[in-house]
Amino acid sequence: MENLPFPLKLLSASSLNAPSSTPWVLDIFLTLVFALGFFFLLLPYLSYFRCDDPPSPSPGKRKCPVGRRRRPRGRMKNHSLRAGRECPRGLEETSDLLSQLQSLLGPHLDKGDFGQLSGPDPPGEVGERAPDGASQSSHEPMEDAAPILSPLASPDPQAKHPQDLASTPSPGPMTTSVSSLSASQPPEPSLPLEHPSPEPPALFPHPPHTPDPLACSLPPPKGFTAPPLRDSTLITPSHCDSVAFPLGTVPQSLSPHEDLVASVPAISGLGGSNSHVSASSRWQETARTSCAFNSSVQQDHLSRHPPETCQMEAGSLFLLSSDGQNVVGIQVTETAKVNIWEEKENVGSFTNRMTPEKHLNYLRNLAKSLDAEQDTTNPKPFWNMGENSKQLPGPQKLSDPRLWQESFWKNYSQLFWGLPSLHSESLVANAWVTDRSYTLQSPPFLFNEMSNVCPIQRETTMSPLLFQAQPLSHLGPECQPFISSTPQFRPTPMAQAEAQAHLQSSFPVLSPAFPSLIQNTGVACPASQNKVQALSLPETQHPEWPLLRRQLEGRLALPSRVQKSQDVFSVSTPNLPQESLTSILPENFPVSPELRRQLEQHIKKWIIQHWGNLGRIQESLDLMQLRDESPGTSQAKGKPSPWQSSMSTGESSKEAQKVKFQLERDPCPHLGQILGETPQNLSRDMKSFPRKVLGVTSEELERNLRKPLRSDSGSDLLRCTERTHIENILKAHMGRNLGQTNEGLIPVCVRRSWLAVNQALPVSNTHVKTSNLAAPKSGKACVNTAQVLSFLEPCTQQGLGAHIVRFWAKHRWGLPLRVLKPIQCFKLEKVSSLSLTQLAGPSSATCESGAGSEVEVDMFLRKPPMASLRKQVLTKASDHMPESLLASSPAWKQFQRAPRGIPSWNDHEPLKPPPAGQEGRWPSKPLTYSLTGSIQQSRSLGAQSSKAGETREAVPQCRVPLETCMLANLQATSEDVHGFEAPGTSKSSLHPRVSVSQDPRKLCLMEEVVNEFEPGMATKSETQPQVCAAVVLLPDGQASVVPHASENLVSQVPQGHLQSMPTGNMRASQELHDLMAARRSKLVHEEPRNPNCQGSCKSQRPMFPPIHKSEKSRKPNLEKHEERLEGLRTPQLTPVRKTEDTHQDEGVQLLPSKKQPPSVSPFGENIKQIFQWIFSKKKSKPAPVTAESQKTVKNRSRVYSSSAEAQGLMTAVGQMLDEKMSLCHARHASKVNQHKQKFQAPVCGFPCNHRHLFYSEHGRILSYAASSQQATLKSQGCPNRDRQIRNQQPLKSVRCNNEQWGLRHPQILHPKKAVSPVSPPQHWPKTSGASSHHHHCPRHCLLWEGI
């Protein structure tokens, strides 16, 4: 306890000698000891947690993020004894340190100085300084701070008056600062002497780097720690609050020992006593270590603040005498001068400092030296800077050197190679010049002062596009370190001269780069205010310019190689008219002035950015133009330069310039060079050199032209070589693309090029006349490209010309033809509604030629000739039927309105209608219909005479297809019931229609059926009402075979209409009657007769009209039959012919939904008697098919007076049908087992009222045909039973009942012949969708329900 300070001795003595003292004294002592020990224990750990935040602008203080690690109070009491033992040792070491400091200070420390140091703090600095010891808690008495403050004034532990020094400081502020720290802040301990800081301490900014190592850095005492400088701030180490001061300022509230200790290295470096050097040797070693780490900070600090200020920051001006201050100022000044001269000696040749890195280093060092010298010549007092420390501008605060270096490097690189805003508002590279200014002389750039030299003469007609002058300060504050404009100091004349010398020696390096940019490309950069300068220095004065030019070309892609060698550094400006200096935008452009300026700037930027490509294009055009001219002649005549010629050509068409943006007339004379100024009359120039224009067509040639053309314009050899090269390229390109061109394909580049070439070609070469549309189909017509592409092969020229014609024809006539087609179709619909005279007016030849021309045009345009095909079909259909029926038939109109989806199944040429007055005649031109692969039927229709006795030759071939016979037989069989239904039953039924799909063969088959029963070829029998099958075009584009009953047709035709028919048609109808009677006679002998059907037939007998009056009427003699046949040929029976013809022609129309009941007429009675006689004759005497009967059939068209001939004809037809039916049965006998399971159920298994839900209209038509065929096959299987009841009931009743019986017992009648009703033979055209489900007959179902 002997070594303790005086206050502790008194406290311990009083506590030990006074046993009656209260326990709180001991508690206070133990608490103090514990606090000290705990502080020293945590001191190494707390040294890592420092507050290095930037200065806060708010007056309040920001707490350090690191707080005290609080421990439970129980644990703290446990460690109180150990802390008490360590506390005396720490106090002893502290007293030793203070004694050394006191001995070092000597006479500088007196009572007045100490009082000044420890006096009241400024208002803003209260609480910012802290004692060396630990902080106290808020409930501790104020006298506890005495042991901490007393050692500061005690030079010796054995002093007699220790309390004098303790009482000398002002008690108020001192105690207030301590108490405020204790109450509001966590403790900020200092490192003990035996635990130095892990990082090199740097309390104050270091002085400039000098050879003297002591002047390199001035470290603080080891009792305090602070982080290195960051963001130009100084952090007070006495507490954890982040109270920072800018450079050049030092807190005035630092504790006395800090100032005293900090002054030791400065005094020793200036020649102080040697005693204190040994005491601070450890500090100097640490300072040398931190000198290298903080060298950049030292240099930056030197560049911004005077050396005296820096020295005062470290050495505290209050502790230095006037002599010491002078010595420090002299030393710093000499150091700055030495640095400046060293930099001057290292400048040397600027060719080695062309890179931005070297320039950056040099300029940075130059700026630092200039600032240091300025600070040296005009220093500021330390105490004046402290008051305004927080009001200094931003650039005065130096940031981290690495960040500053990176920012400066970025800005300088942009300045060296071209700023981002160089094309809009940056440095001056050129200026607008008048027509009289050709040579310019200007001084180099001066960045530190405004230039007063402006050699450019300005006129009042200057373009408003000239950008507003802007000083270099708009580049931002980051450029201000380079362009110094700080108003706080003025450089000395010597420093300014040196700076100007350095800048003048460095910036001419930049000057040669801009002339090449300006003079080669004509780029006019906007000017800054009072700095309009042009750089046109001779190349010989700066040998390093070629290197600069190459570097700039590599970075900016300057195509200077395209220019002529004699125009590289020329500054001559072409003689432009006055209007070339007008604005880019028209004067009457409806925009505001501000918006106009922005638009002009934007356009100017875009032009400058794309000047390279435009310059290449213009260069290539100029080279092409110069190849056709002699360079010597142009030079002798004083011909203007290529740029002048192109610009003068661009001015020729002034009318076009009034409409579009006048980019060609840019204010800058060189701007036209950038644009290339393509001549307005491009066609005239292309005619001058068409080969070269075509050379730009292909992509490969474009790539070649983009390459720099190095040829000299005065060399004819080079011109010939380039011409040959271009021609070879075009030849190779055309050879590769010739195949695609012949196929109709054209590359995009070729199309664009030819569109451009077409402007130069004569109009007559590419114009396609309207009368020669079909010419390209033959490939003979082509564009005359010989005069344009003479170097190409003849075949290549011909193919290319033909392709051009096709291309132009397609694009020129595509739209008109598409509009013309609907108009023609609309006209055809109108024509179809005309009368007979109007329809017969235009000849079919005209229609045929028109259709043919349309087909040719469609084929030429590669479009489906649907309209023309439809027109041909209509023409053929009009030839197939009489004109008298064509105009009045509604089926003809419906056929014309059918959809366009008609397949091309009729390829033969259409028949021409007979001339007027010969309606009865038909042409003898053969008609050929392709049914299946090899099955064809050809027949010739002889001329039919209008007279009654005239014969006609129409020999039906025996090669009638099986399909035709089968369809006719099925229709005839089904009509037996349909023709004689009751009126009530017929209302709910539909006409049976056999629908056929759009297969061309099936459509041919249907037309064959139609032509089979054309006028004069066949007759219908009343007993067997045969169907006159015809092609019906349904609304959905399908075709249907529509059968009709002859009795119904007779009853439906009005009598007045029957009287108006000619006699010639009556004969054809009679022939049809005879033919159908013969066919029916054959079928009568083989019809099945079932006795079980008698009852049902008798019950059904009242439903049908009477057919025969008596059995006796069925057996007339032969003479009576002949008389009746002769009577049929008389005019009084003319309605018969009209009835049959009308029925045949109306077979092309859609059937009505209802069927009118037939009416009995005298003609019907006569027909019935005829067929009764025929049936009785055949029953008694069947006639075999012999050669004589076949001969009779052939001569039947000429002789109709003999009944034997008619009987033979009917016998032959019936036998043929029988053979065909047996053949069909034999072929399908093998398919019984396959379809047996499908047809076990009755045919009408599905209810009739549900047929609309299961089948479409097409399905119902096929179902009826299938059921009819099945019923016919069944009836033929029972000939014996039919013969037994042949004379007991009428024929039609027998067939009807037979069909009903067959429907009831389908398995009994033909168990082995359950053939699919719609499965035709292999040579039949198959119908899809008919064999996968059960079919039903609506008519038979109705009969079944009635029974």
Curated annotation (Swiss-Prot):
Compositional bias ranges of the Basic residues kind: 60-82
Keywords: Differentiation, Membrane, Spermatogenesis, Transmembrane, Transmembrane helix
Transmembrane regions listed in the UniProt entry: 23-43
Chain intervals with Basic and acidic residues compositional bias: 1108-1127, 1137-1146
Cellular component terms per the entry's GO annotation: membrane
GO process annotations (BP): cell differentiation; spermatogenesis
Domain of life: Eukaryota
Residue ranges, annotated region (Disordered): 55-88, 106-233, 374-397, 628-658, 900-955, 1084-1161, 1313-1335
Organism for this UniProt entry: Homo sapiens (Human)
Family under the similarity heading: Belongs to the SPATA31 family.
InterPro entries in UniProt: SPATA31 (IPR039509), SPATA31F3-like (IPR027970)
Name of the protein this chain belongs to: Spermatogenesis-associated protein 31A7
Location(s), subcellular: Membrane
Membrane protein topology class: Single-pass membrane protein
Compositional bias per record (Polar residues), positions renumbered to this chain: 165-178, 631-651, 927-948
Principal subcellular localisation of the protein: membrane
Encoding gene (name): SPATA31A7
Function: May play a role in spermatogenesis.
Pro residues compositional bias, start-end: 198-211
